[in-house]
């Protein structure tokens, strides 16, 4: 049984897959978004204990999300190859939503670090404590020029750095690692489905090319078979005419037998056996009409 025969039609797995794409994973993503809002709020207010607790809860949501994506992946791997295109359209929206949510969560911290570094290098604003990768966005900064002109004032919300002696600093690093792993899982899952579809497309192209080659090859083999069949009586007649008599007849028939053996790949096993039987009958007749000619049986005995 081939690998594809062990798989099933998409319609059999569609209800289970849609449960993940429309209910389970969107629910996890909504919960993750709420954690992100709370994390930003607690860090801005410097409520470190609450922030630490929210990091832990968000990490649990990320782990649950990873688990659900893996379960959905197992279902998708059971879908037959000819349904992969439809499957891809079914899972792409939730996959993109998960990827965007993870990137947004991580980008929040990245933009904070980059902005504060820029402010530090320009020496135009108040410097926050030393930066680490475990930072998010919060307080408001104003440049001197912005304060002079309220119409052109821009606000950059940068969250304060989490003190290294707070548990929230360590819990954020753990959450950050979980988010990166989740992002990689979503990417790998997407690549898996896409690679399977590309493999199917490649196989179809090769099958179409092979079909054309087989058709052309069949035509050529047919022509070759006709030419060989037409040549057999001619070659047999020429040799038989030169030798003459019963021996000449045998020689001519032998040429036909050799040609048939060489052309067995074209004529097939059945055709070869048919010629062989005819040859045997002819030799038996010749042996009976020519007593001096040894038979095949006598040759074997000798």
UniProtKB/Swiss-Prot annotation:
Topological domains annotated Cytoplasmic: 2-228, 276-302
Localization per record: Endoplasmic reticulum membrane; Smooth endoplasmic reticulum membrane; Endoplasmic reticulum-Golgi intermediate compartment membrane; Cytoplasmic vesicle, Autophagosome membrane
Modified residues (Phosphotyrosine): 157
Record SMART domains: t_SNARE (SM00397)
Domain of life: Eukaryota
Membrane topology: Multi-pass membrane protein
Alphabetized Gene3D superfamilies for the sequence: 1.20.5.110
Transmembrane segments: 229-249, 255-275
GO cellular component, as recorded: autolysosome membrane; autophagosome; autophagosome membrane; COPII-coated ER to Golgi transport vesicle; cytosol; endomembrane system; endoplasmic reticulum membrane; endoplasmic reticulum-Golgi intermediate compartment
Sites bearing N-acetylserine, chain numbering: 2
Residue intervals annotated with topology Lumenal: 250-254
This protein's record includes keyword Coiled coil: yes
SUPFAM superfamilies membership: t-snare proteins
Motif placement: Endoplasmic reticulum retention signal: 299-302
Coiled-coil regions listed: 53-123
Residues in t-SNARE coiled-coil homology domain copies: 162-224
Main location group: endoplasmic reticulum
Keyword tags: Acetylation, Autophagy, Coiled coil, Cytoplasm, Cytoplasmic vesicle, Endoplasmic reticulum, ER-Golgi transport, Lysosome, Membrane, Mitochondrion, Phosphoprotein, Transmembrane, Transmembrane helix, Transport
Modified residues (Phosphoserine): 289
Annotated GO biological process: autophagosome maturation; autophagosome membrane docking; autophagosome-lysosome fusion; endoplasmic reticulum to Golgi vesicle-mediated transport; endoplasmic reticulum-Golgi intermediate compartment organization; exocytosis; Golgi organization; intracellular protein transport
Post-translational modification: Phosphorylated at Tyr-157 probably by ABL1. Dephosphorylation by PTPN2; regulates exit from the endoplasmic reticulum.
Sites of N6-acetyllysine modification: 41
Family from the record: Belongs to the syntaxin family.
Functional note: SNAREs, soluble N-ethylmaleimide-sensitive factor-attachment protein receptors, are essential proteins for fusion of cellular membranes. SNAREs localized on opposing membranes assemble to form a trans-SNARE complex, an extended, parallel four alpha-helical bundle that drives membrane fusion. STX17 is a SNARE of the autophagosome involved in autophagy through the direct control of autophagosome membrane fusion with the lysosome membrane.
Known partners and oligomeric status: Forms a SNARE complex composed of VAMP8, SNAP29 and STX17 involved in fusion of autophagosome with lysosome. May interact with VTI1B. Probably interacts with BET1, SCFD1 and SEC22B. Interacts with PTPN2 and ABL1; involved in STX17 phosphorylation. Interacts with COPB1. Interacts with TMED9 and TMED10; the interaction is direct. Interacts with VAMP7. Interacts with RUBCNL/PACER; promoting targeting of RUBCNL/PACER to autophagosome. Interacts with VAMP8, SNAP29, VPS39 and VPS41; these interactions are increased in the absence of TMEM39A.
Name of this chain's protein: Syntaxin-17
Originating organism: Bos taurus
């Amino acid at each position: 049984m081939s690998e594809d025969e062990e798989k099933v039609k998409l319609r059999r797995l569609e209800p289970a897959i849609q449960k993940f794409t429309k209910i389970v994973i969107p629910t996890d993503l909504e919960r993750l978004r709420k954690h992100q809002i709370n994390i930003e709020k607690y860090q801005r207010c410097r409520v470190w204990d609450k922030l630490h607790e929210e990091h832990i809860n968000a990490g649990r949501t990320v782990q649950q999300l990873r688990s659900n994506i893996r379960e959905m992946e197992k279902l998708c791997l059971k879908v037959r190859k000819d349904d992969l295109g439809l499957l891809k359209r079914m899972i792409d929206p939730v996959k993109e939503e998960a990827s965007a949510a993870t990137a947004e969560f991580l980008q929040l911290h990245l933009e904070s670090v980059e902005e504060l570094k820029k402010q530090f290098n320009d020496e135009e604003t108040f410097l926050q404590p030393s930066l680490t990768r475990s930072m998010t966005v919060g307080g408001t900064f104003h440049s001197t020029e912005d304060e002079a002109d309220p119409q052109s004032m821009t606000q950059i919300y940068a969250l304060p750095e989490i003190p290294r002696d707070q548990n929230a600093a360590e819990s954020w690093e753990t959450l950050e690692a979980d988010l990166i792993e989740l992002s990689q899982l979503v990417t790998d899952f997407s690549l898996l489905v896409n690679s399977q579809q590309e493999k199917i497309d490649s196989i179809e192209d090769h099958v179409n090319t092979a079909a054309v080659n087989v058709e052309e090859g069949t035509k050529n083999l047919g022509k070759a078979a006709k030419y060989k069949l037409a040549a057999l009586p001619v070659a047999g007649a020429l040799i038989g005419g030169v030798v003459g008599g019963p021996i000449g007849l045998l020689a001519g028939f032998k040429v036909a037998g050799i040609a048939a053996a060489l052309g067995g790949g074209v004529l097939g096993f059945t055709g070869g056996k048919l010629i062989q039987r005819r040859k045997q009958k002819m030799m038996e007749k010749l042996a009976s009409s020519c007593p001096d000619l040894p038979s095949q049986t006598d040759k074997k005995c000798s």
